[in-house]
Amino acid sequence: ETHMKEKSGLEIRSLTGHFNMDSTSLHVPELVLRTPDSYIRTQADMDLSAVAEQPQGKMSARLMGELGKQDVLLFAGGLPPAFVKAYPNSPVILRLSADGNLDTLNLTTVEARLAGAFELKADGKMFRLADSVRRSGHVNLNLRTRNLDFARALAGEEALKDIALPPMRLDGN
């Protein structure tokens, strides 16, 4: 277990877990990160050959967590005070599940949700991730927005009266 407080304001209350690694694989049964406002739990298993030039092995990763307002604002950095004040005091809920290797990676779950503001869901498959020329993929995307009034503050005081952000829906693949 570890604890730290960084000059930027990031405070890690605890980072706990364990991993096993040998010459062929890495196993992280559980790794938990806690800050005063956030909680993230990850699990991963990886054959080291999954990231080789000719990927053979498999990897799997799971992430679940909640990113609190203070941590979101800290990582975003330099946001206008009006946005900081207007941003909802709710955590961003995250879920991720992926399996495969650098040749073929299946995204079975990608979710991000901020209560009352938005919900994003995606899944898909990506191919040849390490090949900048032949990289490809197919992702199904579903985004629902609700009250995004807090985002209007990013446009500045003058533009606030001219911007409307109604609830929206975006579906794509």
Where does each model-flagged region fall?
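Gram-negative outer-membrane beta-barrel proteins
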Residues: 52, 67-75, 106, 118, ...
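Extended lipid/amphipathic-ligand handling interfaces
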Residues: 2-4, 14-24, 30-35, 40-63, ...
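Extracytoplasmic loops and strand-loop junctions of Gram-negative outer membrane beta-barrel proteins
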Residues: 77-80, 154-156
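Low-complexity, polar/charged sequence tracts that form flexible coils or short amphipathic helices
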Residues: 10-11
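Extended hydrophobic/Leu-rich segments
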Residues: 143, 148-151, 160-163
